[in-house]
Amino acid sequence: MSEVKIGRKKEKCENCTKQCNKKQSDESINSLQEKGVASGEVRESTSVQQVLLSACLSCDGCISEDEGKRISQQNLDEINHVLALNKKCDTSKHKILVVSVCPQSVPFFAVKFQLDVSAAAQKLCGFLKSVGVHYVFDTTIAASFSILESQREFVQRYRRKHHDANAMPMFTSSCPGWIRYAERVLGSVVTPHICTARSPQQIMGSLVKNFFARQQKLTPEQVFHVVVAPCFDKKLEAVRDEFYNSILESRDVDCVLTSGEILHLMEQSKVTVEEVDSAPLDHVIGEISDSGLTRHDGRGSEGFLEHIFKHAAKEIFGLDVQDIVYKTLRNRDFQEVALERDGETLLQFAAVYGFRNIQTLVHRMRKGKVPYQLIEVLSCPGGCLSGRGQAEGEGGRPDRTLVQQMEEHYSSLPVRLPETNPEVQRLYQDWLDGHDSPHAQQSLHTQYKDHTHLPAHITNPDIQW
């Protein structure tokens, strides 16, 4: 790809999408910032720098001016605008306001409210409904779909690995930062290996705008769908062209707000936690008997690696794995797990989190063979609970005390396997017409593409999987 000039101030290069809501009028070009540079040149003449897109390894990569405009609209002003329209007499402009909360965001509110996770979720729900939100959902159900589809895809890839060079390894991630980097920097070296299952956020978007809207006798454009997430980069994912219906002029997710932005909304409202009435979260298909908050097995980022590992061990090798033992390599954010039988390694997976560890992974890819069948990649060290939309402390670094408290709250939730969730199985039939239907493929999967012409040192033909 040709050189892309990016107006970039040195002190702003850590959080590109965080700066999207702040107009940088003093910079030479009105576009957004990157988080960091892995290699290549950074020419620094004044406070404004020019960065080669192909040299940038960041949470979001380079963002175009058009994307920047769309992301900048995802803020509290947009929500307040919808709420204001709903109060006016012209009902033709009214929208049903739906908020979907990521499970990694709820522990943040538990810490801030000084409540347990379930009580904090009900307080959050009560506050949102008090300002005019109609429905509040938990996105754990969408994560269940994403995990199940990822499990199924891994087994399919593994079984065709001998005649499909792109089958292994499979990269799994719900991290838009990693996806951006893979598409814009690594390109065709990696994109065919990325699991096609949509992230929980975008499956939730499809579920709300498709199934839920139809159940409520609404069209998708009559629903304004907000996602509360721990990460600013989720705003970037929401504006991807793949998740926009040009005929209906409707996005699956209209707006992403971080946990910190929702807390700021509460502060703007000048309401205390004690003053907020608790309210139970809603369910996409109505009330069910066991309606408490749950989490998925594994670490605090939905545990894709663990679920796929256990499923593959059973489905491919007939082995029941109860507990997974991680082997730490460089640090706790670069770990391996292996399945062995009679001294033979049957499966070898890796979890790679954080900027530096992704650099290490890419370096190993360039040098030679990567031994893993599956790699879970996340841009934030520590995973999604450490997202900068909720865990950022002084100096732009994660607040370790806050992250530790959130991890403890998240771990306190009971674990439910996606396979045992009756709501998920019911939706496979009522919404998707079965597990392997064209509707399921369309609603639960997407494709990732090579969006750049890569320089020779990245598209190294010697890279072997």
Curated annotation (Swiss-Prot):
TM segment ranges: none
Intracellular or extracellular location(s): Nucleus
Pfam families recorded: Fe_hyd_lg_C, Fe_hyd_SSU
Keyword Methyltransferase: no
Any one GO molecular-function label of the UniProt entry: lamin binding
InterPro entries with a match to the protein in the record: Cytosolic_Fe-S_CAF, Fe_hydrogenase, Fe_hydrogenase_lsu_C, Fe_hydrogenase_ssu
Record bears the keyword Chaperone: no
Annotated keywords: Nucleus
Cysteines paired by S-S bonds: none
GO CC term, one of those recorded: lamin filament
Highest taxon, organism lineage: Eukaryota
Protein family according to the UniProt entry: Belongs to the NARF family.
Protein name: Nuclear prelamin A recognition factor
Native organism: Danio rerio (Zebrafish)
Gene that specifies this protein: narf
